[in-house]
UniProtKB/Swiss-Prot annotation:
Part of the 50S ribosomal subunit. Forms a cluster with proteins L3 and L19. In the 70S ribosome, L14 and L19 interact and together make contacts with the 16S rRNA in bridges B5 and B8. It comes from Pediococcus pentosaceus (strain ATCC 25745 / CCUG 21536 / LMG 10740 / 183-1w). The gene is rplN. This is Large ribosomal subunit protein uL14. One of its GO terms (biological process) is translation. Keywords: Ribonucleoprotein, Ribosomal protein, RNA-binding, rRNA-binding.
Length: 122
């Protein structure tokens, strides 16, 4: 469950290390973001020489949450951290590598490029 002011780790090599959520996209009544949701965030920590800098406002998709997700077959998946991947306007990732596992729900929400770059899909 990601909400305004939540801090997320960045799971790609775009240069950002930590994000602060400004807004969860999807309408005025959407308060919480889950796996596969798009967020608008600002970069709080960045690596030197990266594509994005500290203070940049970016869009990202949530790939891991501590709260987890219920699946149609009755199973439940949760991760150890909240993480996101920075995306461009056409929903393709800004980085060229994805670190750590991502949830299978991203495939259903049409983020195939992120799923193909990820080392593990759970």
């Amino acid at each position: 469950m990601i909400q305004q002011e939540s801090r997320l780790k960045v799971a790609d090599n775009s240069g950002a290390r930590e994000l602060l959520v400004i807004k969860v996209l999807g309408g005025s009544r959407v308060k919480f973001g889950y796996i596969g949701d798009i967020i608008v965030a600002t970069v709080k920590q960045a690596t030197p020489g990266g594509v994005v800098k500290k203070g940049d406002v970016v869009k990202a998709v949530v790939v891991r949450t501590k709260q987890g997700a219920h699946r149609a077959d009755g199973s439940y998946i949760k991760f150890d951290e909240n993480a996101a991947v920075l995306i461009k306007d056409d929903k393709s990732p800004q980085g060229t590598r994805i670190f750590g596992p991502v949830a299978r729900e991203l495939r259903d929400k049409d983020y195939m490029k992120i799923v193909s770059l990820a080392p593990e899909v759970l």
